[in-house]
Amino acid sequence: MATNADPAPTKKPRNSRKALKQKNELVETPPSPVSVKGKSAKSFEQDLMEMQTMLEKMKIEKDKTEELLKEKDEILRKKEEELETRDAEQEKLKVELKKLQKMKEFKPNMTFACGQSSLTQAEQEKANKKKKKDCPETKRPSSSYVLWCKDQWTEVKKENPEADFKETSNILGAKWKSLSAEDKKPYEERYQVEKEAYLQVIAKEKREKEAMKLLEDDQKQRTAMELLDQYLNFVQEAEQDNKKKNKKEKDPLKPKHPVSAFLVYANERRAALREENKSVVEVAKITGEEWKNLSDKKKAPYEKVAKKNKETYLQAMEEYKRTKEEEALSQKKEEEELLKLHKQEALQMLKKKEKTDNLIKKEKATKKKKNENVDPNKPKKPASSYFLFSKDERKKLTEERPGTNNATVTALISLKWKELSEEEKQVYNGKAAKLMEAYKKEVEAYNKKSAATTSS
């Protein structure tokens, strides 16, 4: 086997000593132990200072985190309280909803009398018109002039075939005026007979209507009373149901029921457990288990506090009951006083009413006496210009339009008076002025005569 041959020795260069010398010059001299000690002390102080600043920063951060945690705990606690109150409100709403759902509706059991009219006013009027059409006795009788016109109409139309309704009416009107009293008599008698029959029927109907109205009013009153009784019974039943189902509203002044020994202990422990971020349910469970495991000796101070609370509660309740009784008595007295006051006011009002009624009666009596004592010979005040015109026109209109009601005639007269010119009105104004002059003279004469009689 062939072995590797050792390398041939190389010759050192001549300038190697110079290079070593330069190398040695470049290498640093080792530091002295004193200088090393000083440097290490300085670096330790710096490290210590840095550590202190770091610790301070960490403390500040810790405080900040603690504050943030506290804030978060407070927010969580508030949210829990809000949820609790919301749950309580929801429960209340559910209870109220159940109450409303269970609440009865007022359904009256009414049997309306057959006498009570279910028709509306318009339907009633329609029925009355139909009744008048079917029954000729209920129709208003035609006047003697209209009866005569009916008899003469065909004859006049034969004589004047080209005449229209107005012309025919005018011809008949002229003929009626020229008729003697004997010729008019049979038509007037016929009209009187029909009028009497009509008045009898109307009087009977009116009496029947009045009787039916009285009956209807009586039935309505009875129905209203029955309805009121039913409603009052319904209200009473509803109140009784509410008394059974619902508790009375709490009085804010009423002393609160004392807490038990367990609740005293639980209230004491709650704050500490809440600091540990325990929920309300967890707090309740923990305090319950702790209370069970407590010995009688440890329970004793809490039971002592509970007993003391109960004693103070009983004393407060006695005081509360006493004040309530006093309030009830004072309220009763106030109500009695108020009732007396109302009675007094009512009596005063009644006296005033009686007084005014008596005054009205006296006034009426004095007026009646004055009217009785009026001298029949005393001149009467003359008619006005409009009244004179109205008198003339009424006569004309009744002849032209027989059977027209009084209200329509009055309205027509008023319209005609407005349509008159000043010259036309002057005729009636002159007549009224003459009558007024004559009236004044008569009054003067009357006054002189009455003065002479009184002096004698």
UniProtKB/Swiss-Prot annotation:
Residues in the DNA-binding region annotation: 138-206, 255-321, 379-447
Give me the stretches of Basic residues compositional bias.
11-21
| GO CC annotation terms, alphabetical | nucleus
Superkingdom of origin: Eukaryota
Q: Which UniProt keywords apply?
A: DNA-binding, Nucleus, Repeat
User: Which GO-annotated molecular functions does the record name?
Assistant: DNA binding; DNA-binding transcription factor activity
The coiled-coil segments of this chain are none
Compartments, as annotated in UniProt: Nucleus
Enumerate composition-biased segments (Basic and acidic residues). Answer: 240-254, 354-363
User: What SUPFAM superfamilies has UniProt attached to this entry?
Assistant: HMG-box (SSF47095)
User: PANTHER family recorded for this chain?
Assistant: HIGH MOBILITY GROUP B PROTEIN 13, HIGH MOBILITY GROUP B PROTEIN 6
Q: Where is this region: Disordered?
A: 1-42, 117-142, 238-258, 349-389
Say if the entry is tagged with keyword Ribosomal protein.
no
Q: Which Gene3D superfamilies match?
A: High mobility group box domain
- Species: Arabidopsis thaliana (Mouse-ear cress)
Taxonomic lineage per UniProt?
A: Eukaryota, Viridiplantae, Streptophyta, Embryophyta, Tracheophyta
Protein's recorded name: High mobility group B protein 6
